[in-house]
Curated annotation (Swiss-Prot):
GO terms for molecular function: ATP binding; sulfate adenylyltransferase (ATP) activity. The gene is cysD. GO terms for biological process: hydrogen sulfide biosynthetic process; sulfate assimilation. Residues 280-302 are annotated as: Disordered. This is Sulfate adenylyltransferase subunit 2. It holds the Pfam family PAPS_reduct.
Length: 302
């Protein structure tokens, strides 16, 4: 009897689950980064599948900048309660005391202090030797050249010229004390794969991904949702209610919405099949400077 061939999504699922299980077996203190977005939701689902019917054998970590959408935080807490995983949260208190924010200090400094430095603080605090991330190679050019097992030195820095070969899905997890590995089990997935898998597996995601009427401010052509009263209005800013959704999620002042009628998973998938724009075009942090994502990763960002 001929063996049953796996579908494209089943192959991706199997590869990711194998990576997650291998890290859990190989490392002494792994953690899964949980940014609450669609990729994190898929990665969480895969981790639950990998160890079912048992619990996920490592904690999930959310680095909270204090500027996430309120719906994201509510969703995070609801997911932790529903699935019973261990949720760790960390905020860079030094940044909070300094009043660091995207409006007062700019996107680059805010991202460095509240996200990159906050992440490194959390990794040092708990002594994690491996950290799962939901990055995919199709997202951005610096991520396209990153390994599944991405080696980081004792300062959490990434050197793209010092990467280990990964032949025949064989991964090298050897690290010295203080060093660590960032692991990307979704490396070979595309944005369309993510949405099709969410649809296939009926994975719950933050409602912000679905089109709905929302209060936004047009800032230089970017539609920024006014999520609270901390966003100052400047000359030329135009407030309105538009039918929009988010293709990617981050800190609300640094994440632009897009006009859309896609209010179901089927419509989002149809939109993905027709779009020719970058997934991260709404992430303002990517336009801070030339090669900004690679610079952030060299400094310790995911």
């Amino acid at each position: 009897m001929a063996g049953r061939s796996l579908s494209h999504l089943q192959q991706l699922e199997a590869e990711s689950i194998q990576i997650i299980r291998e890290v859990a077996a190989e490392f002494g203190n792994p953690v899964m980064m949980y940014s609450i977005g669609k990729d994190s939701s898929v990665m969480l689902h895969l981790a639950r599948k990998a160890f079912y019917p048992g619990k996920i054998p490592f904690p999930l970590l959310h680095v909270d900048t204090g500027w996430k959408f309120k719906e994201m935080i509510a969703f995070r807490d609801a997911q932790a309660k529903a699935f019973g995983f261990e949720l760790l949260t960390h905020t860079n208190q030094e940044g909070v005391e300094q009043g660091v924010g995207p409006f007062t200090h700019g996107s680059a400094k805010h991202t460095d202090i509240m996200k990159t430095q906050g992440l490194k603080q959390a990794l040092n605090k708990y002594g994690f030797d491996a950290a799962f991330g939901g990055a995919r190679r199709d997202e951005e050019k610096s991520r396209a050249k990153e390994r599944v097992y991405s080696f980081r030195d004792k300062h959490h820095r990434w050197d793209p010229k010092n990467q280990r070969p990964e032949l025949w899905r064989t991964y090298n997890g050897a690290v010295n004390k203080g060093e660590s590995i960032r692991v990307f089990p979704l490396s070979n997935w595309t944005e369309l794969d993510i949405w099709q898998y969410i649809y296939q597996e009926n994975i719950e995601i933050v409602p912000l991904y679905f089109a709905a009427p929302r209060a936004v401010v047009n800032k230089g052509g970017q539609l920024i949702m006014k999520d609270d009263d901390r966003m100052p209005l400047e000359e030329g800013d135009v407030e309105s209610v538009e039918r929009v959704r988010f293709r990617t999620l981050g800190c609300y002042p640094l994440t632009a919405a897009m006009p859309s009628e896609a209010d179901t998973l089927e419509k989002i998938i149809e939109e993905m099949l027709l779009t020719r724009s970058s997934e991260r075009q709404g992430r303002l942090i990517d336009s801070d400077q030339s090669a900004s994502m690679e610079q952030k990763k060299r400094q310790g960002y995911f």
